[in-house]
Structure formats: structure tokens, C-alpha cells
């Protein structure tokens, strides 16, 4: 057999985000040829904040130690042993809102063991580990052809160019173009849908936060819960500024298409929290007059029936876009990346003549292994958003019930056997080869 006969698998990754670049590193680490096709013209400047659990970090190290090393360079470990969840609605004075009786429940941070980072910082650090030429910018996928008669999958881009690869991993996010091709544009799950939650963010001077909440609350991460809304807040910039995220339930449809950010106003936010305690109203009064309203989309209403078809698969948000209320959506994508890398490693080591069949078997195995856990996360995150806003009937406003439900669901995320997941996936793939 010639060297050419044993050429490594050629993998195309659609999307140069966190999961796409992480997957690329994991595959390169295993000797694959990898090309990442990113629709943007360059890397993003900053981006949102992400947090990764201990389970996700275990997956990163197994995927490629360089991934975890990148995270360690840019991440901040949670400095808080616990997060307190306060009543944002019933206290009628700022003083009452600071009393112990206003604490609904508190959660220890040791199990989730979050490391938080800015998306752009992590992405750029990982990207610096990639060889030159791996990433091609300005490549927006519009179609692909996975005809069995063709030796490779043909990718078609908006600029008129094409490319070929043995296997395609789509990490192109919540509005995945690949998902639309894989499922069909008319499939209910082809597009993510509005979760009926929106979010507003503001940076408040620390002095104003102390005035509204008190010194103790303003210097730690906390959450305030209440009817149809909740507020998550924490200090940043070495305690000089207070970062506030206010989430609202929205009974209406989102009438801005797939535009997820629209202009809004402080008065609109204030109208939504009428009846809340004076401490929350005071914090909102510190928002700038013009704010952005962020729509939260997910796949909870229309979960995908499968994540793979032929030699093409979806990973991360392209497969299971989640709301942020578990803080674990990106962690699911890390688990996806590890399973894919391990299964494709088996394909690459197998007979070249059977590669096309084996790629399909590996991707079907990946889909079957990952779909239950990742889709549980999507639905559970929806439920957690309702729990925080007293819209989840089993818990209502009861702090003890909220805590028990929070801990039960969180345990599914952090108490997870990564080695068992990988071993189970490999065993399932090997059984499919025997069929």
C-alpha cells in the first residue's frame, strides 16, 4: 500500500467559532488534514462571555491539551464559593432587600467549577495554535453535495468557489446554513426559534450598584428572581464596574426575523419591572437611556431528529442551540468535539477502501450518542429560565424547591463520565461495523 493510499482523512469544518477551532485542533492533534471555512472576513474582536465546567475542561484536555492550555491562559476561575439567589420582587425597601430573609437559596460553585472567559480571547489563543492556511475566511456555505457516487463531499460557497472533503463537521452556530441543507429548508428544526426570553445588559458604576444593593451584594456575583424576569449581576474590571444582565419573559412572537439584537430603551425595561422592589428599580434607573434588546433563540421547540446525514454532521449550536440559563451550552459542544475526534480516529485507522461507509457509521454513532444529553440540556435550560422567573409550576416562588430543582438538574451536567461516553461511542461504532 502506498503512502497516498494511507493519506489521512480530509475534514472540512464549517464555522470558525469556539467549537469549530477546538474541533480542528483535536483533529490536527490526531493527524488529520483539516480546513476551517469561516464566513466572516476575520476573527471577531471580543464577543460574549463563556464559562466552562470541569467536565468540559476534561474533554478539552483529552481532545488536545493545547485547548485546555489556551483556556487556562485567558480564563478566570470563579472567585466565589457560592452564588446567592435573592428575592427581587417582595422587599419594599432597599434595607429589607439586604436582609438574610430576602435570600431565596444559595448554590455552592464547587461542582460546576466554572472557568469563565471572553469568547474572542479564547478563540484567538486557540487559533494561534493552528498551522498557516488551515482557516479560510470569507467562505459562506450555501450548499453541499453528498452524492454517494462522488468520492468526496462537495462544498459550495457564496463567492462561487467550491471545495471537497471526506467528511464535513458543521459548527456554524445557531443560524447554521448547514443545518438547513442537511434537514431541508422546510423542516421545522431547520431554524432555531424564539425562546420567549429577551435580555438587556448594562455596565453600572460601582458606586451606583452599592447605593442600590448594598456593599456586600455589589461585590459578589448574585441573582435576583421574580415574576417574569430575573437579574444576574457581578463586578468586573477589578470591582470598578457592575455588570448587569436583566432577562425578561416575552409573551409575544419575535417579529424581527433572525435579527437577534434590536434597539430598546431604559423606559421599556423599567415598565417591565413595575411592582418589583426598589433596589432593582434603582439598578435599572442606572441603565443608559438607549440599550440593546437581545432575543434568545434555541432549538427547544423543534429539536433536531438527528445530527448527521451521510458524511455531514452538525455540532455545537448548529445541532443543539440552547438558552443560557444552565450556563452549559458551549460545554455540550466541547463534548461533541471529543466524540467526533475519537470516532473519526477509528475511521482513519481502518481500511481505506471502506472509508466512505465507515465515515457514515461514525457520524451516525456520534448522533445517537450525543442527541439525548444535548437535547436534555436545551429543554432543561428553558425550564431553568422559567424557574428563575417563577413560571415553573413545580417550584413557583418556593426557594427550597427552586434550590432542589437547580441542584438536581445541575448534577446531570457535572456528574458525568467522560471516559464512559467515549468508550460507549467507540463500542457502538465497532458493533455497527459487525452488523
UniProtKB/Swiss-Prot annotation:
EC number: 1.-.-.-
Compartment(s) of residence: Membrane
Stored InterPro entries: FAD-bd, FAD/NAD-bd_sf, FAD_monoxygenase
Transmembrane spans: 8-28
This protein's GO CC annotations: membrane
Binding of FAD, residues: 38, 51, 119, 317, 330
Transmembrane helix keyword on record: yes
Use of this protein: Azasperpyranones display potential anti-cancer activities. Azasperpyranones A, C, D, and F exhibit potent growth-inhibitory activity against the A549, HepG2, HCT-116, and HL-60 cell lines, with IC(50) values of 2.39-14.42 mm, respectively. Moreover, azasperpyranone D significantly inhibits HCT-116 xenograft tumor growth in BALB/c-nu mice. In addition, azasperpyranones A and C can bind with four kinds of therapeutic targets for cancer, eEF2K, FGFR, survivin, and TNF-a.
Pathway: Secondary metabolite biosynthesis
Pfam families named in the record: FAD_binding_3 (PF01494)
MF term (GO), any: FAD binding
Enzyme type, top EC level: oxidoreductase
Disruption phenotype: Abolishes the production of azasperpyranone A.
Membrane association type: Single-pass membrane protein
Conditions for induction: Expression is induced by the azasperpyranone cluster A-specific transcription factor ATEG_07666 which is itself regulated by the azasperpyranone transcriptional regulator ATEG_07667.
Function: FAD-dependent monooxygenase; part of the cluster B that mediates the biosynthesis of azasperpyranones, members of the azaphilone family that exhibit anti-cancer activities. Azasperpyranones are synthesized by 2 clusters, A and B. Cluster A is responsible for the production of the polyhydric phenol moiety while the azaphilonoid scaffold is produced by the cluster B. The non-reducing polyketide synthase ATEG_03629 produces 5-methyl orsellinic acid, which is then reduced to 5-methyl orsellinic aldehyde by the NRPS-like protein ATEG_03630.
Name recorded for this polypeptide: FAD-dependent monooxygenase ATEG_07662
